[in-house]
Amino acid sequence: METYTGIPEELKFAVLERIQPTEPEREKLFAIQEELASQVKIAAEKLGIPGVLVKMVGSAARGTWLSGTHDIDVFISFPEETSRKDLETLGMAIAREVARYAEHAEDRHAEHPYLNITYKGFDVDLVPCFRVASASQIKSAVDRTPFHNDFVKPRIKGHEDEVLLLKQFMRGGGVYGSELKTQGFSGYLTELLVIRYGSFKNTIYAACSWKPGEKIDIMQHGEIEHEEPLVVIDPTDPRRNVAAALSLDKFCTFIDHCREFLKNPELSFFFPAPILPLEDSEILEKLESRKSTQLAVVFKTPDVVEDVLFPQLYKMEQAVAALLKEYDFTVIKTGVWSGNTETAVMMELISGTLPNVKKHIGPPVWVKVHAEKFKEKYQAADGVFGGYIENGKYIFEILRKYPTARGLLEDRLMSCSLGKQVHQSVNEGFEIIENAGICRLKEYDFRIYLRKWI
Amino acid sequence: METYTGIPEELKFAVLERIQPTEPEREKLFAIQEELASQVKIAAEKLGIPGVLVKMVGSAARGTWLSGTHDIDVFISFPEETSRKDLETLGMAIAREVARYAEHAEDRHAEHPYLNITYKGFDVDLVPCFRVASASQIKSAVDRTPFHNDFVKPRIKGHEDEVLLLKQFMRGGGVYGSELKTQGFSGYLTELLVIRYGSFKNTIYAACSWKPGEKIDIMQHGEIEHEEPLVVIDPTDPRRNVAAALSLDKFCTFIDHCREFLKNPELSFFFPAPILPLEDSEILEKLESRKSTQLAVVFKTPDVVEDVLFPQLYKMEQAVAALLKEYDFTVIKTGVWSGNTETAVMMELISGTLPNVKKHIGPPVWVKVHAEKFKEKYQAADGVFGGYIENGKYIFEILRKYPTARGLLEDRLMSCSLGKQVHQSVNEGFEIIENAGICRLKEYDFRIYLRKWI
């Protein structure tokens, strides 16, 4: 077992100095929250909509936001008996009324529509919700949020800095954010970890020994089994795993980040040095030293939000890897990158070419009907090099249909099961670039991605 | 299910015409057997060795030899109570006395020494054995043979032609011969099949539906379980499987040969067209069309009999394939060929080269002690391209030690577990030839082997 050196207080101060909201920042945020709350009330009155309450939720409301983030979540709460239709139309009417004073407004859609506005420089979500009796009786996913707020706020009081440290530490490790692109830790999850373990430090120490199946149930009320690597039962809903979005690899990356940090507690675990984009010459050097085959399937970035796009890209990544494996190519790794205009599914292969001859293994000779059918089929087929018996099975050496990965993808990519928007975009056209060809992709962010890739 | 067309009588006649010993051939063989028998008796008397009997065994004694084969087995039978030492010295003394009239004599050794002589153009084995009460009480493996003779001779009478047909059919299919090179059917096994099934035709029909584990127990006295694909309990020894030497692939090759024959009963199944040696130009053509990598490990043929050599070659074939797989090369197939001067272990690979980068998969991150050790080791190692977490496991991209199969074999072949004589020979020197390099091997028999190989 490692013996860890502990976390110096000076380090924590140095981090907090950079992430704690300043007093003027706090005052401004609170003032804006007040303003928005009264705007909602005024709008409801003006539109003659009764029973509306305003709830400030999220990290802004709980004092756990990182300095520099300007997100405010305003929940417009309707009586439980309101119909879905009324919730949507009346809720959005109020939101739009508030938006009259905003610099910018945009309709968004989760389970229900909501309005995202820019208000005095803040990024504000105006979200209609039902006011239900408990989080286990919610009518819409967003109804849960006010309960989270009620649970966390009193318990986190005095520990806000610990949450800030943990959030920034997770950012530094690339595991902060529960959106479907990142599949990491949500803000609420971070708060629950601090409530459970008492501090940033204790969370880090505990995580070093986490295993998949790790379970945290603060209220001791979990009702069902969960399959995810980390199970944190929602204190406001015994059936929900707050860490359901956390992938196994992000779970492990966090464990690794904690262990490395405790071995050598440094500022860089919170604020890693920026990654420099890879130059053409570096790409060529790396290709030459690895001598593997790099392949990228490049297509126009579909015009959808990341939470829709990335699950489709991850699905495509799996499908492409499966296709390559099915046709005998050995995949070293796969990845996805998506920029403003172009998106790439990346693959590294042992080799992009295979021999023309393919060993096709048939059924055992003694499984008579199958074996005879198999033999008849291949004996008479075109391009058969030869046949023999090995380990009791018929083997035919047949002509490989796709001796190059490029040819395979060009011909069969569209037969992969792809998500709707990705399918559309790929169907409009895609390009397969290989090895030095990837120098064609110049986007700064792609070149940063490449430095991690090769 | 196939419906077979039956076996035309004319076909059988046509085959028998070529393999049935002619009357003069039979007379001559019988005369020579008589001569040898009396030679043995005279020798025993002359040397003053009492209790010696002569037993003519083998196909010559049972009338089931193929025309043109001139093998005679003369067993010199001693009383059971004879010591091993006496059996060997007295038995060989008698044999040597007989050998005085031979054109050529050569000491050979199975479990005991015996003498192989050429006598009036016949290939004769003079084999000392114990005269035991039953085959289950044998003192030496050869003691069993006279019992085989006693069992087969009366039962095969009148069916000798059926045995001849089956033997020749197996020859045509490359499955006749129980020596360790061939791992096929022995003559005795062929006779037992005809006794069991009644005829050549019935044997062929039955074999079409054989499965591994097929059991034939004519005397219904089998005592132990056998693992081999075909189990034919020795009628003279309930513990012995007569088909123990038959490999799974030869078992299957025979099944296949039977099925194909019944689909299209032709003379070529008994007398296949000779295989022509592959010319250099054909080798190059085939390499170009297959585009795989051919490798041959070539060394001086060890000076031992095939029954010693081939098990060692098969073992080497396995060991080399395992070595290549261990280092990530994909083996399509392996084979061995052995000529008078040179021997080659053949391998066909997807590719003889691999990238420099090798994906090294470590333990899951949560298996703390192992995972941390693994990470520490590779993080600090030379030639590491990078590391990441995938499916919960640490992955390091390390520098591949052997990016070519040739380099691997040159460096590590001697670390393979090799048989004694093969080890000696390989240790004295070996050559690795690749692709067009195999044109260097000119032996006629190798070029015939090559035509089957590629």
From Swiss-Prot, chains A, B:
Nucleotidyltransferase recorded as keyword: yes
Enzyme kind, highest EC tier: transferase
Binding site for ATP: 59, 62, 148, 167, 176
Molecular functions (GO terms): ATP binding; CCA tRNA nucleotidyltransferase activity; magnesium ion binding; tRNA binding
EC numbers on record: 2.7.7.72
Gene Ontology annotations of biological process type: RNA repair; tRNA 3'-terminal CCA addition
Keyword tRNA-binding attributed: no
Pfam families, alphabetized: CAA_C, NTP_transf_2, tRNA_NucTransf2
Reactions mediated catalytically: a tRNA precursor + 2 CTP + ATP = a tRNA with a 3' CCA end + 3 diphosphate; a tRNA with a 3' CCA end + 2 CTP + ATP = a tRNA with a 3' CCACCA end + 3 diphosphate
UniProt binding sites for Mg(2+): 71, 73, 125
Superkingdom assignment: Archaea
Alphabetized UniProt keyword annotations: ATP-binding, Magnesium, Metal-binding, Nucleotide-binding, Nucleotidyltransferase, RNA repair, RNA-binding, Transferase, tRNA processing
Similarity annotation: Belongs to the tRNA nucleotidyltransferase/poly(A) polymerase family. Archaeal CCA-adding enzyme subfamily.
Note from the entry: A single active site specifically recognizes both ATP and CTP and is responsible for their addition.
Record function comment: Catalyzes the addition and repair of the essential 3'-terminal CCA sequence in tRNAs without using a nucleic acid template. Adds these three nucleotides in the order of C, C, and A to the tRNA nucleotide-73, using CTP and ATP as substrates and producing inorganic pyrophosphate. tRNA 3'-terminal CCA addition is required both for tRNA processing and repair. Also involved in tRNA surveillance by mediating tandem CCA addition to generate a CCACCA at the 3' terminus of unstable tRNAs. While stable tRNAs receive only 3'-terminal CCA, unstable tRNAs are marked with CCACCA and rapidly degraded.
HAMAP family: CCA_arch
Assembly: Homodimer.
Record-given protein name: CCA-adding enzyme
Underlying gene: cca
